[in-house]
Amino acid sequence: MSKVTKVVLAYSGGLDTSAIIPWLKENYDCEVVAFVADVGQGAAELEGIEEKAIASGASSCYIADLKEEMVADYIYPSLKTGAIYEGKYLLGTSMARPIIAKAQVECALAVGADAVCHGCTGKGNDQVRFEGAYAALAPQLTVIAPWREWDLRSREALLDYLAERDIPCTASLEKIYSRDANAWHISTEGGVLENTWNQSNELCWVWTKDPENAPEKAETVSILVEKGEVVAVDGEAMSPFNALTYLNEKGAEHGVGRIDIVENRLVGIKSRGCYETPGGTIMNEALRAVEQLVLDKESYEFRETVGLKASHLIYDGRWFTPLCKSILAAADELAQDVSGEVVVKLYKGQATVIQKRSMNSLYSEEFATFGEDDVYDHSHAGGFIRLYSLASRIRALNTQKKQK
């Protein structure tokens, strides 16, 4: 391996990546450039982050505003597939990683770096997601993963490491929970959640109201969907990020989008987390409602198949692969007629579709009515059923012959 001279670090401003900066300089004798991705984690998380990076030893700090791109080019395409990992998880952390890695690589190439670095632990999925993206986008770059190299194995050790070098740090030993936030969701892991028999408490939820304490009066939101994408909410045209932000606020107020799950990590272990995805939950319900009107049976079944495969590809860090690209393209084609208007009721943790319509709807009241009608000849069903069940009939006849 050739000597590393300049490395671009995916920097969050947290304890881990603050310690990584001096560690890289000491162990690789290289220049460290901090790269910060603004994916909607909030202004508080970004306040003073450039100064913090420089104080930790970075030569410079670049902050990339990726909020709109993340929603438009990563979240919306994923939504079209219907991807929900293991039937529950709307892939909040998973979808943020490819865009962060892509922008980090672009930064590395722009500043002439020969290496990239991340602060992911050796137990999690994110190391695979980041390094899979690096390999697909810039295989010539050296990848440094400090958590697989250093001997700093505890929060206390990291704090001592920074204190010994007089590097300021606002972190403390008292931190119990691990959190990850972006425009799509907030995840909370660790603490009481590490025992699956423990109930979550108020510290496990930071974004949404407890449904029990949510407003007693329901609220509705009207969502306009065009080609599988939310383009307006409550009569106002909005950009993807603004639409998500608006629905996040509405959903969080009513306790929408909470899940407490145990999931199968890619690396082979199970983990428990409390995930909050208020706006995403509302968007997903709206899109699926329009699909119910527009997609024929075979197309809907295929979209479900696409969604299942997409959920594993995205979760497993396979965004930048030919298969994932093909899956996303298929979902986008299916979504060309997925346009309509949906009204969603928000109440006590639930997002319930109560009205839906589409100019492309295949639903016909004339054909669907249980009352008397003149458009459907019931006698036609007999021939269809006979042909539809022909294979079963032949199989049964063969079985009867064998038994004689």
Curated annotation (Swiss-Prot):
CDD domains: ASS (cd01999). GO terms for cellular component: cytoplasm. L-aspartate binds at T121, N125, D126. GO terms for biological process: argininosuccinate metabolic process; L-arginine biosynthetic process; urea cycle. It comes from the Bacteria. InterPro entries: Arginosuc_syn_C (IPR048268), Arginosuc_syn_N (IPR048267), Arginosuc_synth (IPR001518), Arginosuc_synth_CS (IPR018223), Arginosuc_synth_type_1_subfam (IPR023434), AS_cat/multimer_dom_body (IPR024074), Rossmann-like_a/b/a_fold (IPR014729). Keywords: Amino-acid biosynthesis, Arginine biosynthesis, ATP-binding, Cytoplasm, Ligase, Nucleotide-binding. It catalyses: L-citrulline + L-aspartate + ATP = 2-(N(omega)-L-arginino)succinate + AMP + diphosphate + H(+). Signal peptide: none annotated. GO terms for molecular function: argininosuccinate synthase activity; ATP binding. Its EC number is 6.3.4.5. The keyword Nucleotide-binding applies. Pathway: Amino-acid biosynthesis; L-arginine biosynthesis; L-arginine from L-ornithine and carbamoyl phosphate: step 2/3. Homotetramer. PANTHER family: ARGININOSUCCINATE SYNTHASE (PTHR11587:SF2). Belongs to the argininosuccinate synthase family. Type 1 subfamily. NCBIfam families: argG (TIGR00032), PRK00509.1 (NF001770). This is Argininosuccinate synthase. It comes from Photobacterium profundum (strain SS9). The lineage of its organism: Bacteria, Pseudomonadati, Pseudomonadota, Gammaproteobacteria, Vibrionales.
